UniProtKB/Swiss-Prot annotation:
A motif ('HIGH' region) lies at residues 42-52. This is Leucine--tRNA ligase. Keywords: Aminoacyl-tRNA synthetase, ATP-binding, Cytoplasm, Ligase, Nucleotide-binding, Protein biosynthesis. The keyword Protein biosynthesis applies. Belongs to the class-I aminoacyl-tRNA synthetase family. The gene is leuS.
Length: 864
């Protein structure tokens, strides 16, 4: 055993032993309780960041603790390898996305291995490999057969210069990110999945999940179940009588409708724009810019009157029709009723364009004014109808019932349940993704690729140039024969949304070599007992994966309908930011490692200078580590300098897993010092720790009893903290243990060996390398086996027993000292000890005790 702790040597030795033993390969075992813990698989962007380190360490700690407690544990890893960043990198570097992706995977895998993670690499999944995405294609075809997948037109962002479809994030201020051209909205055929078919189940099943309430609320709101009324405004055009249909949750305000707004893509808009150049110009303007709902929600609301009116369904009054840029054809009916008096968006729109505002609900004690919007204007819990004829005085529920009944009687509408959730459009007009297994035949139309011909393999040697989809230019990929009639045909060039890849990978981990999509091993491991990932995935990924599980269940592939029993959303890793701003307002960000910060006498930062030139930089505050703010810390540099165990220890100690973690160089130094102390104690006491003599706990001297009492008391708390995933307090417990062991005077070698062994096991899940090596070189492995599967230490309850206890001593209710008494001391003995204590004499100032209050096991209060 070396005197000095050298992390690189210790970690290399431990990892060598683990590789030789194939230590983390997991197998199904029906006789053991399983625990399947999964970190959300990373995108292979090039190198790990500290968010990855934190996520995977949390997973690893969980795995190791539960394995020591007898669970059959599994921690796999894979790569979410398709996606747009690879195409962008390919364009920038002139290499195929496949080359960039596989190089990144190789480097990031080395980094994970350097962290000492308990990953079963035999189960590695890479989503851009045909043996994985074959099953995306296979399930898509099964869903197509069942009507769960279908084709319809959808709206996309079209760059007219690059002749390509853009993702929402590639549209900047309404222009294409590369060409700068104004982006157009286009309707193109796309494939969708009927996630709406599962809306109620997705909502109801949230109740049974051990997920953060915040995530469940976000999914609940995203699904957005609404109870309302779907009805039509009658109109006549070109000799035909029709209805302009809308859906509303506020039918109680129908008498306040003063306009209707329709989407630019609404069929009525196109008809009304004939021979009206100004109207057509506005429609064209609306079709430019992004199609993201978030963009539309925040942009300026604009509209143009069409000069056409529909009839109010209850009064017959004319209602003017407008085209509004805020109305989405993909939501509801592509038309909305405008009630300016009681909808904030409609209120602003009406004020902007001088439209009538008609109050039709009131709240007692409130006065309505059109001068400015007030929150109560939209209140449906306290409001009653006014200025609404026969509906006056009705509260929300009664008004909706009555109005819906009248609309139904007139054949104009009825109550309806709707969802904010829309079917999942999976078609992407991109190269680097799962090919959609469809063949376009001029005679047979769209023909599914036969199952025996799967996978449709994506060529990996193409290099995107930003002008259209490379697959459409690849004759080798594009040209094929129709499987129905044998005619010359073309392959579908759209690929699948990358959320398809991540919707089920955890099921493939369970059976990575299966010749079917999944097999019996999947039902052994799934659902995941613990899923770990960032809150940013709360909606789309987690919702799609839940939907995918339910589809797989309904197709008879798996027995479960929810992929993850429990979810932990780890907090972000934060760091300081520093910048300089030029005359044009452009900021240049500097990495904290390149900056020297000065502090005031209270330790608060008051200034900073760049090390390279000594000139000031601005303090930008604490923010999430990111490339844009240049405030990241390279995990590889941390591992190279301090070792993986120090990086792991700091990330677990600095904050509870679900909370934000503020980076601290001093904290990293502190973690390193602590591990050196653990090693130093083992080295200094290596001979005493090698003693394996049994001992009678009852016959120990007081020093031994005291040390065992402290260690087992802390162990009890640490075990509890491991179970509730509070790893920061586990590390605190280990620090208390080391302090107690270092400070123990007179404890026998056998007691030191026992208590130091407890410390190593408590620390092991957090810092596996150094504890594994100390366990081995100090002979613990010879007694208990390797630390990988050493049994978790049991709390010796007898050791917690104390002959004496300490009570708080109060005089007239104020704490004046402490009183040691026998554990089984009688009330009389405690009272006698209290009045005989020197602190009582000091503060009683000669006055006799009038009353003595004893709270057993806690305090004694002497009243004078």
């Amino acid at each position: 055993m070396h005197e000095r702790y050298v992390p690189a040597d210790v970690e290399a030795a431990a990892q060598s032993d683990w590789r030789a033993a194939d230590a983390y390969r997991s197998k199904e075992d029906a006789n053991r309780k399983k625990f399947y813990c999964v970190s959300m698989l990373p995108y292979p962007s090039g190198k790990l960041h500290m968010g990855h380190v934190r996520n995977y360490t949390i997973n690893d700690v969980m795995y190791r603790y539960l394995r020591m407690n007898g669970y059959n544990t599994l921690m796999p890893m894979g790569w979410d390898a398709f996606g747009m960043p690879a195409e962008n990198a390919a364009m920038a570097n002139g290499v195929p996305p496949a080359q960039w992706t596989y190089e990144n995977i190789a480097y990031m895998k080395k980094q994970m291995q350097a962290m000492g993670l308990a990953i079963d690499w035999s189960r590695e999944v890479t989503t851009c490999k045909p043996d994985y995405y074959k099953w995306n294609q296979w399930l898509f075809l099964k869903m197509l057969e069942k009507g769960i997948a279908y084709k319809k037109t959808g709206t996309v962002n079209w760059d007219p210069v690059d002749q390509t479809v853009l993702a929402n994030e590639q549209v900047i201020d309404g222009r294409g990110w590369r060409s700068g051209a104004f982006v157009e909205k286009r309707e193109i055929p796309m494939y969708y999945m009927r996630i709406t078919q599962y809306a109620d189940e997705l909502l109801n099943d949230l109740d049974g999940l051990g997920w953060p309430e915040r995530v469940k609320v976000m999914q609940h709101n995203w699904i957005g179940k609404s109870f309302g009324v779907n009805f039509g405004f009658p109109y006549e055009l070109d000799g035909e009588k029709k209805l302009l249909r809308v859906f509303t949750t506020r039918a109680d305000t129908i008498m306040g409708v003063t306009f209707c707004a329709i989407a630019a893509e609404h069929p009525l808009a196109a008809r009304l724009a004939r021979d009206k150049p100004a109207l057509q110009a506005f429609i064209d303007e609306c079709k430019r810019g992004g199609v993201a709902e978030a963009d539309i929600a925040t942009m300026e609301k604009k509209g143009v009157a069409t000069g056409f009116s529909v009839s109010h369904p209850l009064t017959g009054e004319p209602v003017e029709v407008w085209i509004g840029n805020y109305v989405l054809m993909s939501y509801g009916e592509g038309a909305v009723m405008g009630v300016p008096a009681h909808d904030e968006r409609d209120f602003a729109f009406a004020k902007k364009y001088g439209l009538p505002i008609r109050q039709v609900i009131a709240v007692e004690g409130e006065t309505y004014s059109t001068d400015a919007w007030q929150e109560w204007y939209g209140d449906k819990t306290r409001a009653v109808c006014v200025n609404s004829g026969k509906y006056d005085g009705l509260a929300y529920d009664a008004a909706v019932d009555a109005i819906a009944a009248e609309l139904k009687a007139g054949g104009l509408g009825d109550k309806q349940i709707t969802y904010r959730l829309r079917d999942w459009g999976i078609s992407r007009q991109r190269y680097w993704g799962t090919p959609i297994p469809i063949i376009h035949c001029p005679s047979c139309g769209d023909v599914p690729v036969p199952e025996q011909d799967l996978p449709v393999v994506l060529p990996e040697d193409l290099v995107p140039d930003g002008t259209g989809n490379p697959l459409a230019k690849s004759d080798a990929f594009l040209n094929c024969t129709c499987p129905k009639c044998g005619a010359v045909a073309k392959r579908e060039t759209d690929t699948m949304d990358t959320f398809v890849d991540s919707a089920w990978y955890f099921s493939r981990y369970a059976a990575p070599d299966a010749q079917t999509m999944v097999d019996a091993r999947t039902d052994y491991w799934m659902p995941m007992d613990q899923y770990i990932g960032g809150i940013e995935h709360a909606i789309l990924h987690l919702l799609y994966s839940r939907f995918w599980a339910k589809v797989m269940r309904d197709l008879g592939l798996v027995a479960f309908g929810e992929p993850a029993k429990n979810l932990l959303t780890q907090g972000m890793v934060l760091n300081e930011t520093f910048y300089r701003e030029d005359a044009a307002g452009k900021k240049t960000w500097y990495n904290p490692a390149d900056v020297t910060v000065s502090f005031d006498d209270k330790g608060r930062p008051v200034g900073a200078v760049l090390k390279s030139d000594g000139q000031p930089v601005e303090l930008g505050g604490i923010e999430k580590m990111s490339k844009s703010k240049n405030n990241g810390v390279d995990p590889q540099m941390l591992i190279d300098h301090y070792g993986a165990d120090t990086a792991r220890l700091f990330t677990m100690f600095a904050a509870p897993p679900e909370q934000q973690l503020e980076w601290s160089g001093a904290g990293v130094d502190g973690a390193s010092r602590f591990l050196r102390r653990v090693w130093a104690f083992g080295f200094a006491n290596r001979e005493a720790l090698a003693v394996r003599a049994p001992f009678d706990a009852a016959q120990l001297a007081e020093a031994g009893k005291t040390l065992r009492r402290e260690i087992h008391g802390v162990l009890k708390q640490a075990d509890f903290d491991y179970q509730r995933l509070q790893y920061n307090t586990v590390v605190s417990a280990a620090m208390k243990m080391l302090n107690a062991i270092e400070g123990a005077k007179g404890a026998t070698p056998a007691v030191l060996r026992e208590t130091y062994g407890v410390l190593l096991r408590v620390l092991y899940p957090v810092v596996p390398h150094v504890t594994f090596e100390l366990w081995k070189v100090l002979g613990y492995a010879d007694e208990f086996g390797p630390l990988l599967d050493a049994p978790w230490p049991k709390v010796d309850e007898a050791a917690l027993e104390q002959a004496e206890i300490e009570l708080v001593l109060q005089v007239n209710g104020k704490v004046r000292g402490a009183l040691k008494v026998a554990k089984d001391a009688s009330r009389e003995a405690i009272e006698a000890a209290a009045v005989a204590d020197g602190m009582f004499a000091k503060f009683a100032e000669g006055r006799p005790a009038k009353k003595i209050i004893v709270v057993p096991g806690r305090l004694v209060n002497v009243v004078v």
